[in-house]
UniProtKB/Swiss-Prot annotation:
Protein EC: 5.3.1.9
One GO term of the biological process aspect: gluconeogenesis
Pathway assignment: Carbohydrate degradation; glycolysis; D-glyceraldehyde 3-phosphate and glycerone phosphate from D-glucose: step 2/4
Protein name in UniProt: Glucose-6-phosphate isomerase
Catalytic activity: alpha-D-glucose 6-phosphate = beta-D-fructose 6-phosphate
Pfam families xref list: PGI
Binding residues annotated for D-glucose 6-phosphate, in chain numbering: 161-162, 212-217, 356, 360, 391, 516
Keywords: Cytoplasm, Gluconeogenesis, Glycolysis, Isomerase
Gene3D superfamilies, per database record: 1.10.1390.10, Glucose-6-phosphate isomerase like protein, domain 1 (3.40.50.10490)
HAMAP family, per database record: G6P_isomerase
InterPro entries, per the entry: G6P_Isomerase (IPR001672), G6P_Isomerase_C (IPR023096), Phosphoglucose_isomerase_CS (IPR018189), SIS_dom_sf (IPR046348), SIS_PGI_1 (IPR035476), SIS_PGI_2 (IPR035482)
PROSITE patterns reported in the protein's UniProt record: P_GLUCOSE_ISOMERASE_1, P_GLUCOSE_ISOMERASE_2, P_GLUCOSE_ISOMERASE_3
PANTHER family documented for this protein: GLUCOSE-6-PHOSPHATE ISOMERASE
Amino acid sequence: MTGSLASNYASWKQLQEIYDKDRAKIVLRDLFAADPQRFSKLSATYNSQSGPGVQILLDYSKHLVTEPILQKLFNLLREAKVEDARDKMFSGEHINTSEDRAVLHVALRNFNDFSIKEEGVDEVSKVLQHMKEFSESVRSGQWKGYTGKTINTIVNIGIGGSDLGPVMVTEALKPFSKRDLNAHFVSNIDGTHIAETLRLCDPERTLFIVASKTFTTQETITNAESARDWFLGFAKDKAHVAKHFVALSTNTSAVTAFGISEANMFQFWDWVGGRYSLWSAIGLSIALVIGFDNFEKLLRGAHAMDQHFKTTPLEKNLPAIMAALGIWCNDFYGAQTLALLPYDQYLHKFADYFQQGDMESNGKFITKNGDRVNYQTGPIIWGASGTNGQHSFYQLIHQGTKIIPADFMAPATSHNPIANSKHHRILLSNFFAQPEALAFGKTEEEVRKELGQNASEALVKSKVFEGNRPSSSLMFDKLDPATLGALIALYEHKIFVQGVVWGINSFDQMGVELGKVLAKQILAQLDKSDDVKGHDSSVRHLPFILQVDHC
């Protein structure tokens, strides 16, 4: 990973020349009309080579590209040494240069196919076995609370990757869940979050999972302490904490001081980034909800995508293709966002999850060499499940002044084929219709023909869709653990490839730190009666205008 400015690559300059010269000719209506085989040329199918069978179809024929442009994009990836960077990641080299760390979420789901040398890698299987034994004891009813009752509620207390991943996966895999085991997730430091969650809990039957690598994360530990205080209000004896609290951490002394048994502490390592941690002990809540066998299928699905990414030529490599298309939209067409639009209600947290996954990874303006970039890096990630989004923000995507690339995704088969699959057929008809409408739009001539000669000019103009809005479509058979694992790994690797091309470090998150440091300074001053010192005039006075409670 060179850290070079992408704009210095010869292929980048060639792509800029193509964009400047040929942009007006890149019209999807014309491209489809000129080539009846465009779909077959600009689509790719992924078939897992190991683990549970997974097939994913990627249709990128509705992107603003031609085959020559695609080849230039792949040249760019090769010039940026993406394949070399990929191999370094998989081998355990310290590609997180700012923190001098390996980046080894792939090791958490490695089933002896990759040779990885890094401290802690050999311990992964032991932690997975610990997770299996614990989750099965809770799910079977063998694990009892302090009054001898079984557990029927789990509360995961974490923030960032310790929350977003488990929330997304447990929602996505709800059809595989233990329905009599309720799962809640508390992340926000706002006391409302923990207070409202505790109202749903029975202290005799609730298990709290405290997810913090250092066991010092302010939001997580504050919430955990409040949960412990609530619990002890009923249980009275601190010894009972050990039956109702477990920790996902590496800080043994802090965990045991809290009252959690060391035997109920699940380890992970500093080469696991928070936004890639659902594959680790952070996934304990997932294993509890869907069962360890299904958690393992999730891992195997991701591992098979890892194999695809590591061994498949770029031209047929789904993460590489999606990364290249994103760079073309982002850096040449000037698109600033990417909408993730799953036509599956179970995936309603998918965009939220990859907001962190993408924006925390590639929201950087400095290369690994210390240069300020002169191009756009990571896009803004957002989205919602279809068809909900159609009735809120699709208006702007279709007729707004911004280019918003979109990734549509849908299962061919529903888990809930109610009304003889009527719901699913309607859902899929919208899934197929939206990319077509975005690509081809509706001309003024077509509108006039539809409305007739008596239609007002204002009405005619308002019904014109310019089209030429880029999108990808991802289809898979049915959303199951292995398929979800493959989808997550697909996007992880796409993000990685883009970071390599842009020359940035996708694996630190320094932008999270400054606000946290200032907040700690202000918090210390809020406990005093005098002015908040050392900050700008609005910060100095707002706490007093808001009458901050010092009690």
